[in-house]
Amino acid sequence: MAMISYSTIVVALLASFMICSVSANFQRDVEITWGDGRGQITNNGDLLTLSLDKASGSGFQSKNEYLFGKIDMQIKLVAGNSAGTVTAYYLKSPGSTWDEIDFEFLGNLSGDPYTLHTNVFTQGKGDREQQFKLWFDPTSDFHTYSILWNPQRIIFSVDGTPIREFKNMESQGTLFPKNQPMRMYSSLWNAEEWATRGGLVKTDWSKAPFTASYRGFNEEACVVINGQSSCPNVSGQGSTGSWLSQELDSTGQEQMRWVQNNYMIYNYCTDAKRFPQGLPRECLAA
């Protein structure tokens, strides 16, 4: 039998500890932060539900902070007349110059599709919205929504299909979130002033409580504890197939084009009226 050197074992062990890869348990890995009992964890930590009524919504956050990672969550959205409601799932750092990577699901009248709203904030500045309709009913079953965030890019995916990529273009003067650790947050709340048809359709409280369900939370990430990352000296040069160096291959690019050609309903990069002084630099570079 071939001998394995001590140094090889040590390197393998160190590599295994560098990156946290966990199929999370809600009881162990998140905390419900608001809602006065409207957030519930059941099934031995495998299922979490958030509810919204006229008095309050609810929300939770990860216990871990991340500086780069791939975060997956399976969500079943509010069914029926969800107009006025927003289910948000995002990464965010604290403070007034925060970074943020957003999925927001804007409810609608029964039979009308949800709007999936995405955005990227760097140092407190957003205005990078792209919106989509989904090609399935997100209320009839769970679907996986993923954020891949590495030093070179952010990729938003739905059931493994990439829908948006935001590249690191710092060399061209565009800010990119890379220095501030972020937690995962999710919430269900009332946004009837703007969420559905620009606020024209209000929340029908006779349909309350509204409920969103979560399972399959997975974090494969560089976890930050007491200011120290579990992935020291991250440069984006991960092992082959690692999310740390992942980029879209030709198949992924084709899938993203299909989604954007058929299901994108708003793109800030084509909204010249919104930016009379000129489109953002990342739009011109793309």
Curated annotation (Swiss-Prot):
Enzyme class: transferase
PTM comment text: Contains at least one intrachain disulfide bond essential for its enzymatic activity.
Induction conditions: By auxin and brassinolide. Up-regulated by abscisic acid (ABA).
Sequence positions that bind xyloglucan: 104, 117-119, 127-129, 193-194, 198, 274
Main location: secreted
Pfam families: Glyco_hydro_16, XET_C
One BP annotation, GO: cell wall organization
Active site: 100 (nucleophile), 104 (proton donor)
SUPFAM superfamilies found in the cross-reference section: Concanavalin A-like lectins/glucanases
Catalytic activity: breaks a beta-(1->4) bond in the backbone of a xyloglucan and transfers the xyloglucanyl segment on to O-4 of the non-reducing terminal glucose residue of an acceptor, which can be a xyloglucan or an oligosaccharide of xyloglucan
EC number: 2.4.1.207
Single GO molecular function: xyloglucan:xyloglucosyl transferase activity
Domain GH16: 25-214
Keyword terms of this UniProt record: Apoplast, Cell wall, Cell wall biogenesis/degradation, Disulfide bond, Glycoprotein, Glycosidase, Hydrolase, Secreted, Signal, Transferase
Signal peptide: 1-24
Intrachain S-S bonds: 222-231, 269-283
Function: Catalyzes xyloglucan endohydrolysis (XEH) and/or endotransglycosylation (XET). Cleaves and religates xyloglucan polymers, an essential constituent of the primary cell wall, and thereby participates in cell wall construction of growing tissues.
Similarity section: Belongs to the glycosyl hydrolase 16 family. XTH group 2 subfamily.
Protein name in the entry: Probable xyloglucan endotransglucosylase/hydrolase protein 23
